[in-house]
Amino acid sequence: MKIEIAIVLILAAAGLGYFVGNMLRKRISDTLVSKAEELASKIVDDAKREAETITKEAELKAKDEVFQAKAEAERDAKEKRKDLQALEKRLQQKEENLDKKMNLFDQRDADLTKKDQALLNREQGLVQKEERLDGLIAEQREKLESISGLSSTEAKKILMDAMESEAKLDAAKRIKVIEEEARETADKKSKEIMALAIQRYAGEYVAERSVSVVALPSDEMKGRIIGREGRNIRALEAATGIDLIIDDTPEAVILSGFNPVRREVAKIALEKLITDGRIHPGRIEEVVAKAEEEVEQTIKEAGDQAAFDLGVHGIHPEILKLIGRLKYRTSYSQNVYQHSLEVAFLCGIMASELGINVKQAKRAGLLHDLGKAVDHEVEGSHAVIGAELARKYGESPKIVHAIMAHHEDEKPNTVLAVLVQAADALSGARPGARREMMETYVKRLDDLERIATSFVGVNNSFAIQAGREIRVMVSSDEVTDERAVVLAKDIAKKIEAEMTYPGQIKVNVIRETRAIEYAR
């Protein structure tokens, strides 16, 4: 019974709870719905207000933009109106200027028409006067011919001959004046440049000879050098191609030969043999071979050193070897290697004074005597041989031409070629640079005087300054001042054609006029 009552109570409580819950849920739901409706209504109202605000702002912005666009359009229109007004004003001014110019042209055209008419009238008057003058000239010519007894052709010829003689005399005088002025200016400038070059480069070297002397520790060494029945000296001469002269000279052996390279090889080999003490044919051949290698190395180093000292780079190795061989070549007892260096330095100094390429000038000066390094088997002058070698080993045409032209084998047509000629003359022609045999020297003086006296009008001639100047005394009755200038050039050309000489020779023609009168 109690259980049933409990169940009934539980069921009643559950029903009551369900009822109360439904009532509460319904009330809460109604409250939430009303709040949601209020919130939605509020959101809608806010959205409407915001939309109205945005719409108003957009309308205001649009109105503002329209206003600004109108204002900008008005400004543009105003500026365009101003530009158009300015353009219209300029066009009006141009039109006025054109009108003025047209009026001016019309005026000038009228003036030119008047001038043309005046010139035409004047021309007609001149034609008439010319006809009258021609008639008068013909009449006067007939009178002159009848008076002088000469035809017009003969008179014209006499006049032309007189004018030609006078013109030649004036031309000769003018040429003399111009040449003197040019010579004074050129001599002064060239002397300044050459003097500066010589002062800035003062090279020193000892002239080579055709013999070398090897010192011996004692005269007993001479017998060892000769060997049994002369076998050592024969082996040494055969290996080197040099003659050994063993005479009464104390403690010395003389090496004689015209090939300086072979002579140097023989000298080095003999010195090594003397130092070593073992002297026999087998040892001689071995030492000579080593000496040849040493000389070849010396030649290569000499070529490299020359290029380094001058600051000239990019020269072919074969050319450098030939330059090194010049160390063992001489010309009139002047060492060609030192001469080439001297010419290169002088060329560079003069080139810097003249404002031309210094490196190129030094290169041409160094290579100008390249042909002298080649043995006699190659035919041709050393200038031609040197130019061919330079061309073969890739030197520029300017360098090749300078080498070819330095002894007039080709006419010099560049400043560089003339510079090399001048530097070569400076190095070779200065006193003491070169020597020649007494017989050659005397013959050269005789040839100079013979060539000078072979010309008409020459009374006497004297070779002075060791044959570097020839003074020619001419007759004042046969040779005029103008003719003396031409005579000096003719003598110089004949000397160049018939003689061989180092440097240059000055031809000095002297004409003396003496006026004698006696006071009584």
Swiss-Prot record:
InterPro entries: HD/PDEase_dom, HD_domain, HDIG_dom, KH_dom, KH_dom_type_1, KH_dom_type_1_sf, Ribonuclease_Y, RNase_Y_N
GO MF annotation list: RNA binding; RNA endonuclease activity
CDD domains on file: HDc, KH-I_RNaseY
GO annotation, biological process: mRNA catabolic process
Key words of the record: Cell membrane, Endonuclease, Hydrolase, Membrane, Nuclease, RNA-binding, Transmembrane, Transmembrane helix
Compartments where located: Cell membrane
Topology of the protein relative to the lipid bilayer: Single-pass membrane protein
Domain (KH) ranges: 210-273
Transmembrane segments: 3-23
EC number(s) reported in the record: 3.1.-.-
Family membership: Belongs to the RNase Y family.
Job of this protein: Endoribonuclease that initiates mRNA decay.
Protein name: Ribonuclease Y
Source organism per UniProt: Geobacter metallireducens (strain ATCC 53774 / DSM 7210 / GS-15)
